[in-house]
Curated annotation (Swiss-Prot):
Interacts with ABCB1, ABCB4 and ABCB11. Directly associates with HCLS1/HS1, through binding to its N-terminal region. Interacts with CTTN. Interacts with PKD2. Interacts with GNA13. Interacts with CASP9. Interacts with ITGB6. Interacts with PLN and ATP2A2; these interactions are inhibited by calcium. Interacts with GRB7. Interacts (via C-terminus) with XIAP/BIRC4 (via BIR 2 domain and BIR 3 domain) and this interaction blocks ubiquitination of XIAP/BIRC4. Interacts with TPC2. Interacts with KCNC3. Interacts with XPO1. Interacts with RNF217. It is found in: Mitochondrion matrix; Endoplasmic reticulum; Nucleus membrane; Cytoplasmic vesicle. This is HCLS1-associated protein X-1. The keyword Nucleus applies. Residues 185-280 are annotated as: Involved in PKD2 binding. It comes from Mus musculus.
Length: 280
């Protein structure tokens, strides 16, 4: 007896090792059981039913199985309560749409939602309907009140954060003027005529620097040309050119004469071999 036969006998499954077994038919069919299948063919047909049981579902209540109905559904038979389980799942899935979907579809606002004051009056252009008075030629009506007669609301003062800012400790180094805190439109022409440009134009830090570049050029005749260029922070450039003759450099700097002599190959041979020829 195989493990599947023991499992089938424990749960009360009929028909051991049937080629019609939908669960264990392909797994339990061995070469040694071919002879037993021929003898038990009639018993298997009675256990699982033929065409008469395929559509009416009239199997004994102690057997377990399933059949296909003519309507295209699958029906389980047995004492395991599969019919109730499938029925419960169908009721859950049918009610799931009521939990997720809205009860009514959203509606787009129609033209009746517009108020009469917001509609374009006859003879009024699109520009006049969008701009505020007095930029537009005709004032608009809001809730029965003309735009020109409406009282302007007093602007709210800007919040003074004071020491609550993240860099309040740097206020002593870079003080913030009160004009930079206010975020509102101002008439700068009248303010300049009354107070001048001093309060508006804040002093800006200036940096001073100077750049010096020196270039020396040695010509073939030994003349040295030196260019000294000085550029300051304001962009002024000053260039000084100095020429130094060859005989002046030989008198003032003996090392330069030796270095210039080493550049000539004949001078090098004279230094190396001159002693031998002069001594002889």
């Amino acid at each position: 007896m195989s493990v599947f036969d023991l499992f089938r006998g424990f749960f009360g499954f009929p028909g051991p090792r049937s080629h019609r077994d939908p669960f264990f038919g392909g797994m339990t069919r061995d070469d040694d059981d071919d002879d037993d299948d021929d003898d038990e063919a009639e018993e298997d047909r009675g256990a699982w039913g033929r065409e008469s049981y395929a559509f009416d579902g009239s199997q004994p209540p102690e057997e377990f199985g399933f059949s296909f109905s003519p309507r295209g559904g699958m029906r389980f038979h047995g004492n395991f309560g599969f019919d109730d389980l499938v029925r419960d799942f169908n009721s859950i899935f049918s009610e799931m749409g009521a939990w997720t979907l809205p009860s009514h579809s959203p509606e787009l606002p129609g033209p009746e939602s517009e108020t009469p004051g917001e509609r374009l009056r006859e003879g009024q252009t699109l520009r006049d309907s969008m701009l505020k008075y007095p930029d537009s030629h005709q004032p608009r009506i809001f809730e029965g009140v003309l735009e020109s007669h409406a009282k302007p609301e007093s602007p709210k003062p800007a919040p003074d954060w004071g020491s609550q800012g993240p860099f309040h400790r740097l206020d002593d180094t870079w003080p913030v003027s009160p004009h930079s805190r206010a975020k509102e439109d101002k008439d700068l022409d009248s303010q300049v005529s009354q107070e001048g440009l001093g309060p508006l134009l804040q002093p800006q830090p200036k940096s001073y620097f100077k750049s010096i570049s020196v270039t020396k050029i040695t010509k073939p005749d030994g003349t040295v040309e030196e260019r000294r260029t000085v550029v300051d922070s304001e962009g002024r450039r000053e260039t000084t050119v100095t020429h130094q003759e060859a005989h002046d450099s030989s008198r003032s700097d003996p090392d330069s004469q030796r270095s210039s002599a080493l550049d000539d190959p004949f001078s090098i041979l004279d230094l190396l071999l001159g002693r031998w020829f002069r001594s002889r």
